């Protein structure tokens, strides 16, 4: 597992670690200080994941700008 301030190798790794943190926090078994540390790491991972998603979206926009027939449309998740 990466060190506390180290960025995960990939988006998928960050997401997996974030899911693990959520599970531990939801269990309610962590002491307060550990829970705060886990929460802090979770916030870091969420921000890193959001940044990676924004970078991917920018790459898609660049690729689509080369193809004038294709236009990007907002993504709407089915589960919302």
UniProtKB/Swiss-Prot annotation:
Catalytic activity, as annotated: Exonucleolytic cleavage in either 5'- to 3'- or 3'- to 5'-direction to yield nucleoside 5'-phosphates
GO cellular component, one term: exodeoxyribonuclease VII complex
BP GO annotations: DNA catabolic process
Predominant cellular place of this UniProt entry's protein: cytoplasm
A family per Pfam: Exonuc_VII_S
Transmembrane feature ranges: none
Uppermost EC category: hydrolase
Localization per Swiss-Prot or TrEMBL: Cytoplasm
Entry annotated with the keyword Ligase: no
Keyword Nucleus: no
EC number: 3.1.11.6
Coiled coil (UniProt feature): none
GO molecular function terms attached to this record: exodeoxyribonuclease VII activity
UniProt keyword list: Cytoplasm, Exonuclease, Hydrolase, Nuclease
Reported function: Bidirectionally degrades single-stranded DNA into large acid-insoluble oligonucleotides, which are then degraded further into small acid-soluble oligonucleotides.
Record's subunit section: Heterooligomer composed of large and small subunits.
Family: Belongs to the XseB family.
Name of the molecule in the record: Exodeoxyribonuclease 7 small subunit
Organism, as annotated: Salmonella typhimurium (strain LT2 / SGSC1412 / ATCC 700720)
Species classification: Bacteria, Pseudomonadati, Pseudomonadota, Gammaproteobacteria, Enterobacterales
Name of the encoding gene: xseB
């Amino acid at each position: 597992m990466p060190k506390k301030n180290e960025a995960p190798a990939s988006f998928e790794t960050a997401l997996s670690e974030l899911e693990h943190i959520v599970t531990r926090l939801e269990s309610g078994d962590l002491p307060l200080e550990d829970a705060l540390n886990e929460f802090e790491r979770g916030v870091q991972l969420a921000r890193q994941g959001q940044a990676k998603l924004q970078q991917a979206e920018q790459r898609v926009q660049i690729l689509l700008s080369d193809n004038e027939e294709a236009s990007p449309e907002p993504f709407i998740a089915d589960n919302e």
